[in-house]
């Protein structure tokens, strides 16, 4: 069954809270909820989880059984019929059915509760359930499947056992079998139906998604066994085969979609989304946090995998699989001090060299498994999409936010270490520095680039993993403490903040009377700015932040970093740290970058340049290009998101420092407060960041987070309005889009982090640029694809262009000898590995500065002839073009004749490049008979400058045939 994204996301009933939120979720990067049709087919996403593609019959029995109990359940079941495949036996319910069933009557649920629980366990209909009961059902389901996809930490309860209710929570009847989730079950619905979530629920991270069964309390009476059997039989006909690993990105996107996780995507409810507890967090934001979370990264990578099977899917490590049961709780050290600053409007000084924060970000962690290893990360994301000014002793909005630089996730240097060690000490991120220097060469390690006069929200992420390389597959638990929100400034604006810093920070020498006039100077500046009163009242700040959490049911209230502010007093001039940038911006850059990769090569080139400034490698530059492209979209997204965020932001306080438990659900599951989304975003950000520093640096503890992937709910922590993304952003789901996202050029910072994570996961597609730098042969189809060199020529196809970074014109432009491409010919064997060829081959045409495109399998857009063309020069181009489309030939000719010269700077340069390419091609040809195809590719690559690595055999073969023509001309 192929679902249209619209069908999946928009088919929900109008009265469904998800439906209402759907409009707001339009910005979801992976799944556009927009009304406009998208060519993106969810089938790719569903394929992983939908082993059963065909049967609408599986749920018919369920429908009947439920129909007896509840009319609504019947309706839900009916919807499910469409989505459920016979194999899955109802394991996959259409998302709309889940949502529509969110309103199922409790009576029907109660009647069928035991049967539903059992059935749900067997059929995994409770994919979207966020209540503890539902979660337990999901756990049961996963047990039945034998593989637990959910990232939740709670041990699965025995199948058929009614989900235990959380202590202190009124028992919630399990949702109907078919209505995979009751209103409280759906993450979105959870937000929509606060009545189901007692305020106490969100305080413990375990509540909702990850809460271990609290006990039988409130369990609905089991339904008559015969009824149960019927439902189970109907739903369980064939036990659904364990669903393939779901693309993390796809899962995140779907899970974060307003409709809620799509049951089809999450077989057996293996992925449980922590329930949002609106009661606990009146200000909780709906799905789609402003931040890109680690989960976003995982999801994005998963989506990419779906699009590009060659890439290893990022799989969330199932916490249940490792047998570790933990219920992490995080508290912010120095909370009182943070609150003092927050009341006045915390300001953090950012400097070119980087300034530590004060109060410091310090946390205490409890509830960890003593033996299991954990990785702790911190990132700083834009709290909203506004620029502020301090006027009349108060902070006020001064306009839309500036584009955010790629944000990075700062990995605690002690990571990974055992829970026992983490719990014995205060976890301090005092070494993290805030800077406004976009060219900071060391920023990817310990600094985060922020924009002055912008508001940022630090986020604390806890991941159970024994290796940083496993981050992409791990469950991120994100904790956000609203009181740690701050505005980045180059000089303190509010005198009260200055005084607070002086009073509490022993290192705030610059502002003391003995500060050699530094304080006076700053005060003068502040006075000029009219700093007299609180720069921001917390409410305003929170409202500003709302967009960040908008994507989520709410800002993860449970995320309350209690950093010991006093410890980092030395960083009196704490700088604002925007890891993610406006939640929308980072997200946007990711998805948007993909789009722009397709649509805006020039922007991508700029972004690439930007990334290079950031110190990223060529791959980083590509990511940067995406980021740059994203930046523009980012602003619009920010504005849109901000409006939404402001609405949601008000109540989204990280009042529940412990409430992260919900986030514990899993990388794919949004944290109960939506932290998972943030977590995903963080992961995505981390991946992007990793890519930004240079694809190869992923393992570094600091995950440099560029704008994280735009996790829809989870994937788009940065929540850029979908409108900002061209439809191509959906392309993330598309193979080309995914490839683009994976391709360095296509990667935005968020993707970069994902890419970095993927790199750690050995996803060449994500880290194709990294591989190119490393000289590894790109394995993923994306790598096989040529990344466009940001050539002036538009790429032939949006999809192709994203991955075929090199358009016929673009390749031709560099055809002389791409800095690495020409090398491809010389590289010979190296050429086979596009990246290697780049590194090994001489770069006869340094004149063409476009970053070497990461070898992507030759995109259809870039004909092999292009590769030949550079070699042949004008004539060679003609020969090579023989097999290319007229437009391609023309572009090639232009490239060879004039464009090539332009890139090289002169005809002579072009000629020299061609000569080098020819020599390299000849050398390659002679040296690598066994790689003839590759040789041809290398020749072509020389001409294309970045076609060098084209692992795809068929492409190679094609190139080879062309090579015959090309080599003839070239060698001659």
From Swiss-Prot:
Biased composition, class Basic residues, residue ranges: 274-286, 952-963
Region (Disordered): 44-248, 263-286, 508-563, 645-676, 805-889, 918-972
DNA-binding region of this protein: 332-513
UniProtKB keywords: DNA-binding, Nucleus, Phosphoprotein, Transcription, Transcription regulation
Phosphoserine: residues carrying this PTM: 887
UniProt-listed InterPro entries: Optomoror-blind_N (IPR021101), p53-like_TF_DNA-bd_sf (IPR008967), T-box_DNA-bd (IPR046360), T-box_sf (IPR036960), TF_T-box (IPR001699), TF_T-box_CS (IPR018186)
Name of the gene: bi
Entry's localization field: Nucleus
Pfam families (UniProt xref): Optomotor-blind (PF11078), T-box (PF00907)
Biased composition (Gly residues): 818-831
Gene Ontology CC annotations of this record: chromatin; nucleus
Official protein name in the record: Optomotor-blind protein
A GO MF term: DNA binding
One Gene Ontology biological process: positive regulation of DNA-templated transcription
Biased composition (Pro residues): 155-176, 213-225
Tissue expression summary: In third-instar larvae, expressed in the brain region that will develop into optic lobes and more weakly in the thoracic part of the ventral ganglion.
Compositionally skewed regions (Low complexity) per UniProt: 49-80, 97-142, 177-193, 201-212, 226-237, 835-851
Role noted for this protein: Essential protein that may function as a transcription regulator. Vital for pupal development. Required for proper development of the optic lobes and wings, and abdominal pigmentation.
Disulphide bridges, residue numbers: none
Chief localization: nucleus
């Amino acid at each position: 069954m192929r679902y249209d994204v619209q069908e999946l996301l928009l088919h929900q009933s109008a009265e469904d809270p998800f439906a209402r939120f759907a409009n707001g979720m339009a910005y979801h990067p992976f799944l556009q909820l927009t009304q406009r049709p998208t060519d993106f087919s969810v089938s790719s996403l569903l394929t992983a989880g939908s082993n059963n593609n065909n049967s609408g019959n599986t749920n018919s029995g369920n429908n009947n059984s439920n129909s007896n109990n509840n009319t609504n359940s019947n309706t839900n079941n009916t919807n499910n019929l469409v989505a459920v495949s016979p194999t899955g036996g109802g394991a996959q319910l259409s998302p709309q059915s889940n949502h529509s069933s969110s309103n199922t009557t409790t009576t029907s649920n109660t009647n069928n509760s035991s049967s539903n629980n059992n059935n749900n366990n067997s059929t995994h209909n409770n994919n979207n359930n966020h209540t503890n009961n539902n979660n337990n059902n999901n756990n049961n389901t996963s047990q039945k499947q034998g593989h637990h996809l959910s990232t939740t930490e709670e041990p699965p309860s025995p199948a058929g056992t009614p989900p235990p209710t959380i202590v202190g929570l009124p028992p919630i009847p399990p949702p109907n079998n078919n209505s995979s989730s009751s209103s409280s079950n759906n993450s979105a619905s959870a937000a929509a139906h606060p009545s189901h979530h007692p305020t106490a629920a969100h305080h413990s991270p375990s509540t909702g998604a990850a809460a271990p069964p609290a006990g039988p309390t409130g369990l609905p009476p089991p339904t008559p066994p015969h009824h149960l059997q019927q439902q189970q039989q109907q739903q369980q006909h064939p036990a659904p085969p364990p669903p393939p690993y779901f693309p993390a990105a796809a899962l995140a996107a779907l899970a974060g979609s307003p409709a809620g996780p799509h049951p089809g995507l999450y077989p057996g409810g293996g992925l449980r989304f922590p329930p949002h507890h609106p009661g606990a967090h009146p200000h909780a934001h709906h799905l789609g946090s402003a931040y890109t979370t680690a989960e976003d990264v995982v999801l994005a990578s998963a989506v990419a995998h779906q699009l590009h099977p060659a890439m290893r899917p990022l799989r969330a490590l199932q916490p249940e699989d490792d047998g570790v049961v933990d219920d992490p709780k995080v508290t912010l050290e120095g909370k009182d001090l943070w609150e003092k600053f927050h009341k006045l409007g915390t300001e953090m000084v950012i400097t070119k060299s980087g300034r530590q924060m004060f109060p410091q970000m310090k946390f205490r962690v409890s509830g960890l498994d003593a033996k299991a290893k954990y990785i702790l990360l911190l990132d700083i994301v834009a709290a909203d999409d506004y620029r502020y000014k301090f006027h009349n002793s108060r902070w006020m909005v001064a306009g839309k936010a500036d584009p955010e630089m790629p944000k990075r996730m700062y990995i605690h240097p002690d990571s990974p270490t055992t829970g026992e060690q983490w719990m014995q000490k205060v976890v301090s991120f005092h070494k993290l520095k805030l800077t406004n220097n976009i060219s900071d060469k060391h920023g990817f390690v310990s600094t985060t680039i922020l924009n002055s006069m912008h508001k940022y929200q630090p986020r604390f992420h806890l991941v159970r993993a024994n290796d940083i390389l496993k981050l992409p597959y791990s469950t991120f638990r994100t904790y956000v403490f609203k009181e740690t929100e701050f505005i980045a400034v180059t000089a303190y604006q509010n005198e009260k903040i200055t005084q607070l810093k002086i009073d509490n920070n022993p290192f705030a020498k610059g502002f003391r009377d003995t500060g050699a006039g530094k304080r006076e100077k700053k005060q003068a500046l502040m006075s000029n700015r009219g700093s007299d009163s609180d720069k921001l009242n917390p409410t305003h700040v929170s409202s500003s932040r709302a967009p960040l959490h908008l994507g989520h049911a709410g800002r993860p209230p449970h995320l309350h970093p209690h950093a010991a502010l006093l410890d980092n007093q030395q960083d009196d001039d704490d700088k604002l740290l925007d890891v993610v940038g406006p939640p929308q911006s980072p997200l946007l850059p990711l998805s948007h970058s993909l789009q722009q990769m397709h649509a805006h090569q020039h922007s991508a080139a700029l972004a690439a340049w930007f990334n290079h400034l950031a110190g990223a490698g060529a791959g980083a530059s590509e990511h940067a290009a995406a980021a740059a492209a994203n930046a523009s979209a980012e602003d619009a997204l920010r504005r849109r998101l901000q409006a939404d965020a402001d609405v949601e932001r008000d109540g989204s306080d990280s009042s529940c420092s412990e409430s992260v438990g919900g986030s514990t659900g899993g990388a794919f599951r949004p944290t109960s407060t939506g932290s998972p989304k943030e977590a995903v975003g963080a992961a995505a950000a981390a991946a992007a960041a990793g890519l930004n520093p240079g694809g190869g640096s992923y393992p570094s503890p600091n995950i440099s987070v560029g704008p994280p992937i735009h996790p829809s709910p989870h994937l788009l922590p940065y929540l850029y309005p979908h409108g900002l993304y061209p439809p191509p952003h959906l392309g993330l789901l598309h193979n080309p889009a995914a490839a683009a996202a994976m391709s360095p050029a296509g990667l935005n910072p968020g993707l970069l982090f994902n890419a970095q994570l993927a790199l750690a996961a050995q996803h060449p597609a994500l880290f194709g640029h990294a591989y190119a730098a490393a000289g590894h042969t790109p394995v993923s189809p994306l790598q096989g694809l040529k990344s466009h060199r940001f050539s002036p020529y538009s790429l032939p196809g949006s999809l192709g262009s994203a991955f075929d970074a090199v358009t016929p014109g673009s390749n031709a432009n560099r055809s002389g000898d791409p800095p690495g491409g020409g090398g491809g010919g010389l590289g010979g064997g190296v050429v086979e590995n596009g990246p290697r060829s780049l590194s090994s081959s001489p770069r006869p045409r340094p004149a063409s500065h476009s970053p070497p495109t990461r070898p992507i399998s030759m995109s259809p857009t870039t004909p092999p002839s292009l590769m030949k063309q550079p070699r042949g020069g004008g004539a060679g181009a003609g020969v090579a073009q023989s097999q290319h489309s007229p437009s391609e030939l023309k572009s090639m000719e232009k490239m060879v004749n004039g464009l090539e010269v332009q890139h090289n700077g002169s005809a002579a340069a072009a000629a020299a490049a061609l000569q080098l390419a020819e020599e390299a091609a000849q050398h390659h040809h002679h040296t690598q008979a066994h790689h003839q195809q590759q040789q041809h590719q290398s020749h072509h690559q020389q001409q294309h400058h970045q076609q060098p690595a084209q692992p795809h055999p068929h492409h190679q073969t094609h190139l080879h045939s062309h090579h015959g023509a090309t080599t003839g001309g070239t060698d001659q």
